Amino acid sequence: MSQLNKWQKELQALQKANYQETDNQLFNVYRQSLIDIKKRLKVYTENAESLSFSTRLEVERLFSVADEINAILQLNSPKVEKTIKGYSAKQAEQGYYGLWYTLEQSQNIALSMPLINHDYIMNLVNAPVAGKRLSKRLYKYRDELAQNVTNNIITGLFEGKSYAEIARWINEETEASYKQALRIARTEAGRTQSVTTQKGYEEAKELGINIKKKWLATIDKHTRRTHQELDGKEVDVDEEFTIRGHSAKGPRMFGVASEDVNCRCTTIEVVDGISPELRKDNESKEMSEFKSYDEWYADRIRQNESKPKPNFTELDFFGQSDLQDDSDKWVAGLKPEQVNAMKDYTSDAFAKMNKILRNEKYNPREKPYLVNIIQNLDDAISKFKLKHDIITYRGVSANEYDAILNGNVFKEFKSTSINKKVAEDFLNFTSANKDGRVVKFLIPKGTQGAYIGTNSSMKKESEFLLNRNLKYTVEIVDNILEVTILG
């Protein structure tokens, strides 16, 4: 088994505690069901002693037993589902933030970490597995338990068994169902945790962290042979672990029951380096004291969640005038090569520059020149300070619309306008954009971007230029695609 650092050990202990808490909750739910069933069983067995054999066979009496058992289990069924979903959501959140916790603490660095969306987690928790939602699978096992318990009671009454004998049968059926629920909980929570951890790996790599992932198996007699073989194996973030014809980006993601169900494996990060840009703001910091995950979460996540929500507004005449003043002051403080880079981008160099950033084909002879413009434009944008939450617009083709809708980061610079009509006019400018749409951008203050306005080569575009590598989320509101910049 791979050696864990102290932060990874902290997370592992927390995961065990979460599992034990879920185990206790499920145990108590099934225990209460068993108590309620045994109360009815006591009545059945006491009454059966005074009934003739033919009376015991009455259909109405058999239906009564079945209905009462169903009612007991249906009463507690929502508690089982709520417990499993709560555990799954908690592990999904910890799978994501736990990675950032170990990265920040082990590397002594504060990272630009995007917050994970609650709706994203709940969609993940509720996602069907093998075509069936969690609720349907739980209903199936609940109905099986109800049928088995009912059959045991009726069979016992027919055969004249004692309360103790029938109760033992019911104990066994209930325990089996409880263990099945626990297996589902472990598998479901493990699945959501693996998905969000993978999401964290990919976002960390995009930030400039040279990171790999390593398979970590719990080595004991219950561990699958295939997972023992995977233990300690390292792959790149985007690669899959492969074993005997199956492949997956992480544990419980094979899509094969024989590899996924009740799996206790995890992955851990292996950091080979941090980009100089990420290190730059942390050079003077001393090594921080050890923080538990809960302490780190309180500092980094709850603190961000408690911040006031942005107040996005469309700029009126005075707001636009103030923004232009900020732009003029910004340009006055730029170096000549930075001003030239801005002019080049807003004239005819933007397409070639963005092709490089999107890793598309480009003319190698032009690369040094274009890369130099990109670097100067980066430096220029970093000096602009956006003071307010603003709304901008961009006219996009159908292809770009789909790319934005299905993405989460802009690798290239992105031109927008504070004037919606500019975006609308762009769509009418060429027939190639006849199926295009206007996209709305919600840009929080402090976002890495710059208002160019009349300092642009295209002075009437009222352009706000977003820097490259910005993360974002999307939402469709009133049939309009809204892009919220995260940073």
Swiss-Prot record:
This chain's protein is named NAD(+)--arginine ADP-ribosyltransferase EFV
Cross-referenced SUPFAM superfamilies:
ADP-ribosylation
* UniProt source species: Enterococcus faecalis (strain ATCC 700802 / V583)
Catalytic residue list:
R394, S415, E463
Which ranges carry the TR mART core domain?
315-487
Which of UniProt's keywords are assigned here? Coiled coil, Glycosyltransferase, NAD, NADP, Nucleotide-binding, Nucleotidyltransferase, Secreted, Toxin, Transferase, Virulence
Q: Which domain of life is it from?
A: Bacteria
- The UniProt annotation places NAD(+) binding at 346-358, 394-400, 463
Gene3D superfamilies in the cross-refs: Toxin ADP-ribosyltransferase, Chain A, domain 1
Q: Which residues form a coiled coil?
A: 2-51
Q: What's the EC number here? A: 2.4.2.31
